[in-house]
């Protein structure tokens, strides 16, 4: 469905973007993929991987910046919203900043998508949004509800929104695996409860789930 289309990924220099971009280029050959993120160094490093590929465009910006989002969303067909404050302790210590990015940023993405006539938006979320026990989960729950409700907000523009909730993503920055690796030689393994389990998903499966959401969605789904 992405053939000859323009795709934008917010937070596109993160772990998901690094997996999504090459796989999508290979499978669908879109006209353009726009990487929208606020870290110029990460963009510079990522750009070296695609030097000479006219299908890749980099756009410095923050989802908190409504005007910049509107500029970036021009002529975009599909948006993957991956930008977020997601490290739990960081969110707890910086609650106002977490809300600005995860909730206000979501509202800006929704408005820009409607007004720029984007066809479909898939927002990345987390299983921590289900019965949240921390600020990160609470802000993502609010964000999810905004995206679901926005399917009745677009009016005649027809923009459609869906949400994908991941568990612990193997290979992503901030995942628990690097922490486990760092303490494996200490002989101690701190866990919340001996019966605790973690649901894990690979980045490859995460990308495939986003593809499925775009192809399957009618608007309002949480995958």
Q: Model features per residue range: what roles?
A:
Residues 41, 64, 197:
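Adenine-nucleotide cofactor-binding loop residues
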Residues 23-32, 117:
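Conserved S-adenosyl-L-methionine
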Residues 37, 59-60, 100:
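Conserved residues in the N-terminal Rossmann fold of short-chain dehydrogenase/reductase
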Residues 51, 57-78:
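Conserved Rossmann-fold cofactor-binding substructure of NAD(P)-dependent oxidoreductases
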Residues 78-81, 85-145, 149, 161:
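Conserved Rossmann-fold NAD(P)-dependent oxidoreductase catalytic core, especially the SDR/UDP-sugar
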Residues 28-42:
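Conserved glycine-rich Rossmann-like NAD(P)H-binding loop of the short-chain dehydrogenase/reductase
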Residues 6-26:
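N-terminal Rossmann NAD(P)H-binding glycine-rich loop of SDR-like oxidoreductase domains
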Residues 133-136, 141-223:
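NAD(P)-dependent short-chain dehydrogenase/reductase
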């Amino acid at each position: 469905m992405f053939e000859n289309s323009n795709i934008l990924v917010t937070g596109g220099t993160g772990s998901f973007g690094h997996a999504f971009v090459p796989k999508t280029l290979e499978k669908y050959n879109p006209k353009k993929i726009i990487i929208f993120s606020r870290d110029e160094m990460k963009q510079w490093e990522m750009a070296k991987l695609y030097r000479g590929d006219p299908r890749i465009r980099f756009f410095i910006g923050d989802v908190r910046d409504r005007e910049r989002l509107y500029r970036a969303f021009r002529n975009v067909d599909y948006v993957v919203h991956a930008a977020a404050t997601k490290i739990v302790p960081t969110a707890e210590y910086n609650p106002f900043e977490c809300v600005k990015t995860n909730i206000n940023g979501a509202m800006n993405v929704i408005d820009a998508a409607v007004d720029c006539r984007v066809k479909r938006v898939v927002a990345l979320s987390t299983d921590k949004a289900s019965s949240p026990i921390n600020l990160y989960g609470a802000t993502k729950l609010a964000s999810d509800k905004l995206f679901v409700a926005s399917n009745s907000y677009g009016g005649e523009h027809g923009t459609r929104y869906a949400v994908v909730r991941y568990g612990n993503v193997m290979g992503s920055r901030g995942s628990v695996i690097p922490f486990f690796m760092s303490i494996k030689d200490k002989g101690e393994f701190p866990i919340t409860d001996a019966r605790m389990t973690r649901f894990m998903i690979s980045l490859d499966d995460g990308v495939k789930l986003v593809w499925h959401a775009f192809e399957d969605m009618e608007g309002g789904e949480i995958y």
